[in-house]
């Protein structure tokens, strides 16, 4: 379990890989996933490395596969994903893959080009068909005398006087429907009203051959006189991207053309169907293998990218690599290298040699499907230094527990648990489906977090005795009313005249002792329920928050002990723990003391902790209305405040001064030159312990100059941040109380405003009404209390773990 509570022990290893076996060895190491390669060519340009051509070839294959995938998705063909993890192809197989992908890409491009040309011809013929159909209606209307009178205005008055025959030209075409109004105004203004426009809508939308979108269009015919107007009309049509088509003048010619167009449309439709069938077959065949192809190509690209990080021996027969790897996995890494050498057919084994280094290794925390989500929560705030305590195991308990304190409801916890259990039991099937829904994938990846949050919420709901805003009377209330009549001053007359009465726990028999588990259900109907729960939850939030913060500070002690840094213990951890304990730890003790020191008989004389805590910082003890909790309280509190104040310079000044003293001492004990001869003063045993180089530190101390100003600034920032953080974070933990109160109130409002209405119906149709009201209640419960309130509590729990 050591690797769970602290990051894995890492080592730097050097690999000697034979050129013919390097590809397979890196492939096996990649499948193992236990090593991190270092870049041994940092000064070499990316485009000048040895395997850059292979990387480019892989990128080109990846581009072709993305094109094929785009076409598959455009055709709405499901991509088959069996969850198979194919082996990486050998380098010699790259040519076959390239040829296969090139063939598929060229075939699809050719099909798309031909299909686009066919669709363009089909669109033109379809538009021509509608033009012939609509223009026939226009010409039939020309026989109307009213239309002739309207059209006669196109002639000059002088021509009408001479009795010249009416000779009008016309053009016909198709234009997008939304451009018709602007098109008509432009014609009227440019041609000064000397044209006659008729238009009719095409009922069915037409497919654009380029984009594949369906567009609504209209047929138009424009009558004019003279070549000048004809040229203007054609330029306007060209500007509005209208398609013009030849239209015969005689009905017989139009009829013959329409017949020919319909025949060509039928033939073209048949060719289009065959082309689409062929395209579907090609895409369906590609959809079966494209996921496997993607994995193969990307594995090859990753291998060649990794090989570019290696150095090449001068003999060009060996590749040298440096990797960080866990010490516990060295045997499996050796086995992977042997397996890669065997697959390549090489007779020379690969060599792994451990190296000594002062560089800080990377942090590696082993996870599984259960701990992965909690580790991600920790890493979202920051990844710890190498071999530091890993907070993730503790977060497995603290995170869902703090969430449950805010979300505590037995009923809602059961619902959340059932949802998480469903995802856990069906995780294999859900993983195999490879859902593209990002929101669902996010929720599913945190299924074990949700499971624990639901279980802890069920537990805290039982403590709060809250189930959908109602209490569970499992053991019977510990409060009794009868002693108030027999031993108290209650009577029937008092009940009739007094709307509100208060039970007196000081009377024997009224209060029978604490409830066996959780809060007594009698509080659910008490008028002072909110005041009681607020007091309880507020104090509980402060207690939990301070314990959580003290635990976080205590974890730093384990790091200081492990890294053998006594200076950080004496000048960091001890003043920090004293500062927090003397102020906020004392507050927790006061809370418990007040709970135990005052009972039902003396509770009326109990002083206010808030006033005492404020007066503690103000050194104000003249208020006689708020009496002391115990003897010697004033002296003890003054002592604690002074101790806390002394801890501030202890944290702020002591460490920089000690570090400066150690630096000057090392410098004095260092080497000196006398007449060109280097002479050194060897440190004593005590000094050697002080200046011992820590190989596990975050950086190498060799060659570093001590900067006193930087150290003082850093320590000042840390001290101010810690002191202010103790205050602000303690206040932040009050959100446990606030969100718990909000959740309980929302649950009560939802019950009162929704389900209570259905239960109050006493008519024959009450069951039917209750059915629909319960459906609304269930939907609102899931949407508001589970999703919205759950997400809010999750984010606040995350915030509290970041401040710990």
Residue ranges of each PLM-predicted region?
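Long, charged N-terminal accessory/stalk domains
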Residues: 1-394, 399, 410-412, 423, ...
């Amino acid at each position: 379990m050591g690797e769970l509570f602290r990051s894995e022990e890492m080592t730097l290893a050097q690999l000697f890989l034979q050129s013919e076996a390097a590809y397979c060895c890196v492939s096996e190491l990649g499948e193992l996933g236990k090593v991190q390669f270092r870049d041994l060519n940092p000064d070499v340009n990316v485009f000048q490395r040895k395997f850059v051509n292979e990387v480019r070839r892989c990128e080109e294959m990846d581009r072709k596969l993305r094109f094929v995938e785009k076409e598959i998705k455009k055709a709405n063909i499901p991509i088959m994903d069996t969850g198979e993890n194919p082996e990486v192809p050998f380098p010699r197989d790259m040519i076959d893959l390239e040829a296969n992908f090139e063939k598929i890409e060229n075939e699809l491009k050719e099909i798309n080009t031909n299909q686009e040309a066919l669709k363009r011809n089909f669109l033109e013929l379809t538009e021509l068909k509608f033009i012939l159909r609509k223009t026939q209606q226009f010409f039939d209307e020309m026989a109307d005398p009213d239309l002739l009178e309207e059209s006669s205005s196109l002639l000059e008055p002088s021509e009408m006087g001479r009795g010249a025959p009416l000779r009008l030209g016309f053009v016909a075409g198709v234009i997008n429907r939304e451009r018709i109004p602007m098109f008509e105004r432009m014609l009227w203004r440019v041609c000064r009203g000397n044209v006659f426009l008729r238009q009719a809508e095409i009922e069915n939308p037409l497919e654009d051959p380029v984009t594949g979108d369906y567009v609504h269009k209209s047929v138009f015919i424009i009558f004019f006189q003279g070549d000048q107007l004809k040229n203007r009309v054609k330029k306007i049509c060209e500007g509005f991207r209208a398609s013009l088509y030849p239209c015969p003048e005689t009905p017989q010619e139009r009829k013959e053309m329409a017949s020919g167009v319909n025949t060509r449309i039928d033939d073209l439709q048949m060719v289009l169907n065959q082309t689409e069938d062929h395209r579907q077959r090609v895409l369906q065949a590609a959809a079966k293998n494209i996921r496997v192809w993607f994995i193969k190509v990307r594995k090859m690209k990753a291998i060649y990218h990794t090989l570019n990080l290696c150095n090449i021996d001068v003999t060009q027969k060996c590749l040298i690599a440096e990797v960080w790897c866990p010490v516990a996995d060295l045997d499996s890494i050796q086995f992977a290298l042997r397996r890669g050498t065997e697959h390549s057919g090489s007779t020379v084994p690969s060599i792994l040699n451990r190296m000594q280094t002062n560089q800080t290794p990377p942090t590696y925390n082993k996870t599984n499907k259960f701990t992965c989500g909690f580790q991600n929560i920790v890493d979202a705030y920051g990844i710890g230094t190498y071999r530091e305590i890993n907070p993730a195991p503790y977060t497995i308990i603290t995170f869902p527990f703090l969430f449950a304190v805010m979300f505590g409801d037995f009923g809602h916890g059961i619902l959340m648990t059932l949802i998480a259990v469903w995802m856990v039991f069906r995780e294999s099937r859900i993983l195999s489906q490879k859902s593209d829904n990002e929101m669902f994938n996010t929720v599913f990846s945190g299924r074990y977090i949700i499971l624990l949050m639901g279980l802890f919420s069920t537990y805290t709901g039982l403590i709060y005795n809250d189930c959908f805003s109602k209490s569970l009377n499992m053991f019977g209330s510990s409060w009794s009313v009868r002693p108030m009549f027999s031993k108290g001053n209650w009577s029937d007359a008092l009940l009739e005249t007094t709307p509100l009465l208060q039970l007196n726990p000081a009377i024997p028999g009224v209060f029978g002792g604490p409830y066996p588990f959780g809060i007594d259900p009698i509080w659910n109907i008490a008028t002072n329920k909110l005041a009681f729960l607020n007091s309880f939850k507020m104090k509980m939030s402060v207690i939990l928050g301070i314990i959580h913060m003290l635990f976080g500070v205590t974890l730093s002690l384990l790091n200081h002990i492990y890294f053998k840094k006594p200076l950080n213990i004496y000048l960091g951890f001890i003043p920090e723990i004293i500062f927090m304990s003397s102020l906020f730890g004392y507050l927790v003790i006061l809370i418990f003391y007040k709970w135990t020191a005052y009972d039902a008989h003396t509770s009326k004389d109990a002083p206010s902790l808030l006033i005492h805590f404020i007066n503690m910082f103000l050194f104000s003890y003249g208020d006689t209305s708020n009496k002391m909790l115990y003897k010697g309280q004033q002296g003890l509190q003054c002592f604690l405040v002074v101790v806390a104040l002394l801890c501030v310079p202890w944290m702020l000044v002591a460490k920089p001064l000690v570090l400066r003293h150690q630096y000057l001492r090392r410098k004095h004990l260092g080497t000196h030159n006398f007449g060109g001869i280097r002479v050194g003063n060897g440190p004593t045993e005590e000094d050697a312990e002080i200046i011992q180089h820590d190989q596990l530190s975050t950086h190498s101390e060799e060659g570093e100059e001590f900067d006193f100003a930087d150290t003082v600034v850093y320590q000042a920032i840390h001290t101010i941040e810690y002191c202010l953080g103790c205050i602000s974070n303690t206040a932040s933990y009050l959100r446990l109380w606030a969100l718990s109160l909000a959740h309980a109130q929302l649950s009560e409002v939802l019950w009162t405003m929704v389900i209570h209405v259905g239960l109050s119906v006493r008519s024959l149709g009450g069951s039917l009404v209750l059915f629909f009201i319960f459906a609304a209640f269930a939907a609102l419960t899931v949407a508001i209390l589970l999703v919205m309130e759950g997400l809010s509590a999750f984010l606040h729990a995350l915030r509290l773990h970041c401040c710990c």
